[in-house]
Amino acid sequence: MQVQLETLSNLERRMNIALPMAAIETQVAERLKRVARGAKIQGFRPGKAPLKIVEMNYGAQVREEVMGEQVQQGFYKAVTEQSLRVAGYPRFEPVAAGDDKESFKFAATFEIYPEVKVGELAGKEIEKPNTVVGDAEIEKTIDILRKQRTRYNRVEREAAEGDRVIIDFKGAIDGVAFEGGSSENFPFVLGQGQMLAEFEAGIVGAKEGDIKTVEVNFPEDYHGKDVAGKTAVFEILVKNVAEATLPEVNEEFAKALGISDGDVEKMRGEIRKNVEREVKRRLQARIKENVMQALIDATELELPKALVSLEIGRLVEQARRDMQQRGMNVKDMPFPPELFAAQAERRVKLGLILSEIVEANKLEAKPEQVRAMITEFADSYEQPEDVLAWYYESADRLEGPTSMVLEDNVVEFVLSQANVVAKDLSFDELMGSQA
């Protein structure tokens, strides 16, 4: 086998390979003999057709298979001998042999992995947020849980903020009805911003049975482009006004949250445990994101186009599956690759950087770390032992937790090298507005 390597760019290579035709012909002949043993050809008993007849029927197919295998084997043998790390898949193409009838020549164009030099981390400032969970945060969480179980009771009074109203409405712009401008038996809660402020203001103070005429100015940046910047007149029939009633924090409430004996203090303890677990998870996610961004900012790296393209394909397929699971018809929906390019580039770059840090510093996910992570995850289920056992039934199931532990170890390593700046983060900032 003869090999000639060309450098086309920093990462792109072209390898010209010549394989001995005699070896290929030997492989073809041996393969045809094996095929002949079971070949079913009209006019002959199975396996009894002459080799020439077998070659006439199967020769082209066998030759194509052998050539494909020889090209693959020849290429990967050549890159191994030259210590090249191929990124993505090579592109093969035949090369005219000319007067050389004793060789089969082909070219492989491919990219190699870049040399990764992680930027200086010593002194790199990385923010590490911290959030304290106190009694006030537990009470706030209980209030959120109460609001999620709000009951609405019909009242015979004027509608006020916080009430749920049920209405019929018809809207028109310049006297012409427009798409999405009418509905019947439409429920919403006043003051939650579900409707435009002018629309809601026209209902506040109305009673059941009232008919209100309300003028609404749609903002210029309104999501409905057909009505953005225009003025509509709505005729609104108020069909029901209901007042919100929150459940009391008592035995019944505790039972509704899964506390079988209705012990309120036990309920608070469970809520605290769940909140602390969620706060820990979100803090870890923020710290990890800060570390990853620091690594990206500190490292200049040319990315193999092949890896980015493969990652775009994965992201597109993931987006397609997510939409299908939400009941959307994605059969003819376009997924422009450029929409996923930035995310793909970031993921590829991070993957290369993390691999380099792991290899250079001999980091590993220890079995006890993996077990601790799975145990912590399993504790959020009613039968944690079953969850733990499920993971350890198959090595494949351990791959996800193992990768996560390895990432966590990279984060800890980077933090040990960098200048970590502590920052207090309020509960609301960390969790987002949930009220």
Curated annotation (Swiss-Prot):
PROSITE patterns: FKBP_PPIASE
Single Gene Ontology MF annotation: ribosome binding
Top-level taxon of origin: Bacteria
Keywords: Cell cycle, Cell division, Chaperone, Cytoplasm, Isomerase, Rotamase
Gene Ontology CC: one annotated term: cytoplasm
Residues annotated as domain PPIase FKBP-type: 162-247
Subcellular location as annotated: Cytoplasm
Main location group: cytoplasm
EC code: 5.2.1.8
Catalysed reaction equations from the record: [protein]-peptidylproline (omega=180) = [protein]-peptidylproline (omega=0)
InterPro entries: PPIase_dom_sf, PPIase_FKBP_dom, Trig_fac, Trigger_fac_C, Trigger_fac_C_sf, Trigger_fac_ribosome-bd_bac, Trigger_fac_ribosome-bd_sf, Trigger_fact/SurA_dom_sf
Listed GO biological process terms: 'de novo' cotranslational protein folding; cell division; chaperone-mediated protein folding; protein transport; protein unfolding
HAMAP family named in the record: Trigger_factor_Tig (MF_00303)
PANTHER family found in the cross-reference section: TRIGGER FACTOR CHAPERONE AND PEPTIDYL-PROLYL CIS/TRANS ISOMERASE, TRIGGER FACTOR-LIKE PROTEIN TIG, CHLOROPLASTIC
Domain notes: Consists of 3 domains; the N-terminus binds the ribosome, the middle domain has PPIase activity, while the C-terminus has intrinsic chaperone activity on its own.
Family, similarity comment: Belongs to the FKBP-type PPIase family. Tig subfamily.
Job description of the protein: Involved in protein export. Acts as a chaperone by maintaining the newly synthesized protein in an open conformation. Functions as a peptidyl-prolyl cis-trans isomerase.
Protein name in UniProt: Trigger factor
Phylogenetic classification of the source organism: Bacteria, Pseudomonadati, Pseudomonadota, Betaproteobacteria, Neisseriales
Gene for this chain: tig
